[in-house]
Amino acid sequence: MNPLILSMIMATIILGTLIVMTSSHWLMVWIGFEMNMLAILPVLMKKYNPRSMEAATKYFLTQATASMLLMLAITINLIYSGQWSTANPLNPTTSIIMTLALAMKLGLSPFHFWVPEVTQGIQLSSGLILLTWQKLAPMSILYQISPAINMDLLLSMSLMSVAIGGWGGLNQTQLRKIMAYSSIAHMGWMTAVMTYNPTMALLNLIIYILLTTTTFMTFMLNSTTTTLSLSHTWNKTPLLTTTILILMLSLGGLPPLSGFLPKWMIIQELTKNDSIITPTIMAITALLNLYFYMRLTYSTSLTMFPSVNNMKMKWQFNSMKQTTHLPPLIVLSTLILPMSPMLMLLE
């Protein structure tokens, strides 16, 4: 893609998200979502092939349906209140429809089916944008309407998302699908605490984006998309491959890595609010995520796949890609846990 066109498209994606996050008018929020959706379609189709075309079509149909539901909710709210302001309290019907629309945009269960399929059909760089930046706009609106959200609806979707995010990733060998199911599970954790403590949900979103960005960047550096190709990177960049495995354990939520912090804080917040069954179920289903990450770590580090002799010479060829941005990201993605007392004071 032409760099000038790509920069214009990326600027439109950023502008659309910022419009959603800063608007106090519901129509401008909807326009921001539409700008963002239409601008990201060329990014998804950056590598022109049938898989990317199919992925972009699935993404468009899902997001268009979600936008239609969002406009329906905005219209009902306008009929009831006569105001376009986002600061105006929502009535229960509007709140339910808007929550469903945002859940579809985020990929929460039972609207999660598009996330693994779309992520698998696009490039790693496009997948990074899809699973990180594209979560900001819906989460910001969810944050704004959090006092009016139907708690039972959101908690049920959260529990289903955590469970499906764990079950779905168990049988996968494609790294992009594993990251997609991990994203579904993380969204479930964030939305579970949204009605109790929205600020904590945003803090967890930041940690999730940090972990996912670092993992995707290491995949892009090694050009790895499957478990098999990940195991072959030992010959080329052994230190970076070790880092990838630690990052995956962090994404799975294994202490004392950074990924354990969001789960710890969310379980603590839910138990403070006399919710015992929900965090118990979430903690048990989180073991599924940890299991498939540990299995992936085991299969790539402790077992060697068959490889031809010329694979053993990969270490002689240095990568020309810049890696200066990776060390600080890796440190933050693995060693944030000691900062937890300070982060808890910020709430």
Curated annotation (Swiss-Prot):
The keyword NAD applies. It is found in: Mitochondrion inner membrane. One of its GO terms (biological process) is mitochondrial electron transport, NADH to ubiquinone. Keywords: Electron transport, Membrane, Mitochondrion, Mitochondrion inner membrane, NAD, Respiratory chain, Translocase, Transmembrane, Transmembrane helix, Transport, Ubiquinone. The chain crosses the membrane at residues 4-21, 26-45, 59-79, 96-116, 122-142, 148-168, 201-221, 242-262, 274-294, 326-346. GO terms for molecular function: NADH dehydrogenase (ubiquinone) activity. It is a multi-pass membrane protein. Its EC number is 7.1.1.2. One of its GO terms (cellular component) is mitochondrial inner membrane. Its main location: mitochondrion. It catalyses: a ubiquinone + NADH + 5 H(+)(in) = a ubiquinol + NAD(+) + 4 H(+)(out). InterPro entries: Complex_I_Subunit_2, NADH_DH_su2_C, NADH_UbQ_OxRdtase_chain2, ND/Mrp_TM. Core subunit of the mitochondrial membrane respiratory chain NADH dehydrogenase (Complex I) which catalyzes electron transfer from NADH through the respiratory chain, using ubiquinone as an electron acceptor. Essential for the catalytic activity and assembly of complex I. Core subunit of respiratory chain NADH dehydrogenase (Complex I) which is composed of 45 different subunits. Interacts with TMEM242. Belongs to the complex I subunit 2 family. This is NADH-ubiquinone oxidoreductase chain 2. It comes from Syconycteris australis (Southern blossom bat). The lineage of its organism: Eukaryota, Metazoa, Chordata, Craniata, Vertebrata.
